Regions:
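SF2 helicase/translocase ATPase core recognition
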Residues: 1-16, 114, 122-123, 127, ...
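Cytochrome P450 catalytic domain signature, combining two hallmark sequence patches
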Residues: 17-24
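Conserved Helicase C-terminal RecA-like lobe
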Residues: 1-15, 27-146
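Short alpha-helical scaffold segments that flank and stabilize functional sites
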Residues: 21, 81, 172-176
Length: 201
């Protein structure tokens, strides 16, 4: 996915500010532990910017999120083909944005994150009701142990450092009882830290 110009600018600003902060921290003689924590925090901000800049800047225009635009296109292509989707993100804020997107489009969906109390009810609904085309799932909350064979498309909205966690999430659709071919999509923002995450996998 190619970032929009506004998104590239936002990403470059955050990257520049991260480099400046880390340089200041190093010059101040900070411990290795402090440097590591600061680096992880800055990487997190860059990864969030790749997903949707509104995660770091709530005033950022929604239509300038390249990944959301790409997801929208993929979603409608899949729906037109009669497919049902599992959409994973490690960021609950991303899932909330996708939830708002689906609500605005009038699409029914199931939703599961770490705070969901009705976990099995959501799973049963998706499995049994074929009028529900999308299941939004937090990677940590629903990446293991669920049987979601009603889906034949898996979308990873953002890459995870641990490829095993992604593979386990994709396996939710590959369970016994799956009689369709399952297609897995990974949305990766080109020229960013997401490509580095992919290489580390």
């Amino acid at each position: 996915v190619e970032m929009t110009e506004d998104q590239q600018e936002c990403y470059a600003d955050i990257r520049q500010s991260a480099e400046t902060e880390l340089s200041k921290l190093a010059d101040s003689g900070a411990s290795e532990g402090a440097m590591r924590m600061k680096t992880l925090t800055q990487l997190l901000r860059l990864r969030q910017t790749c997903c949707d800049p509104r995660l770091v800047d709530p005033d950022f225009p929604a239509d300038q999120s390249a990944k959301l635009n790409a997801f929208r296109e993929l979603l409608y292509t899949c729906l037109e083909g009669g497919h049902r989707l599992l959409v994973f993100s490690q960021f609950v804020k991303v899932l909330q944005l996708l939830k708002a997107e689906l609500e605005a489009a009038g699409l029914t969906f199931c939703y599961l994150d770490g705070s969901s109390k009705d976990r099995m009810a959501q799973v049963d609904r998706f499995q049994e009701d074929d009028t529900v085309p999308v299941f939004l799932i937090s990677l940590k909350a629903g990446g293991t142990g669920l049987n979601l064979t009603a889906a034949d498309v898996v979308v990873h909205f953002d890459p995870w450092w641990n490829p095993a966690a992604e593979a386990q999430a994709s396996d939710r659709a590959h369970r016994i009882g799956q009689d369709k071919q399952v297609t897995v999509y990974k949305l990766i923002t080109s020229g960013t830290v997401e490509e580095n995450v992919l290489q580390l996998q």
